[in-house]
Amino acid sequence: DEVELSNLQRQVVHGDDDVGRKKVDSAAEFVSDLNPDVDVERHDLRVSPDNVEALIDGYDFVVDGTDNFRTRYLVNDACTLAGIPFSHGSIFQFEGQITTFAGGDDSPCYRCMFPEAPPAGMVPNCATAGVLGVLPGTVGCIQATEAIKSVLGAGDLLDGRMVFYDALKMEFDSVEITKKDDCPVCGDDPAIDSVHDVEYTASCAITRDAEPAVSDD
């Protein structure tokens, strides 16, 4: 994935001179320049069922900032099966949502909320609908806060809670997320024991019917 001019208004890692460069190289150099004591490991590849387990192996926390349902389900399944906590963040126009899946016995996962992806074309992407330039940074800072808290064992994570941010109204709301007993990944009788049990296509579908487990806080 290469840096494009349209990327520059919503992040601080890449600059105008980086247009056309690989994002992984530009981002790694930015972090190294900011703090040369940080050990940056580059992964110049597309996440897939064949490599996701090796990619997350050895990490204490994963930050999911992906922009498509296929990869979100893949990251969820891999982290949940491996017992690695991870933060989920997504954005749309003027709104963002963030939660942390801690992987505990009572912790829900992404499939507890959304067992399957919405039909193709139902949710517009950011290229079509647009996104407020500062919104990714706002959501990303909250995710970074969750990562630091998790590593330090400090405070309370957004485990079992989803935070919704409305930039136009400058409001934060949260809803409770409940673990589902029939979740195909973290439920009592899981149907998914490996990322190779799922065909990560448009729907990321499995054979079990379930309803989203989100309730008003």
Predicted regions and their residues:
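Adenine nucleotide-associated cytosolic modules
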Residues: 1-217
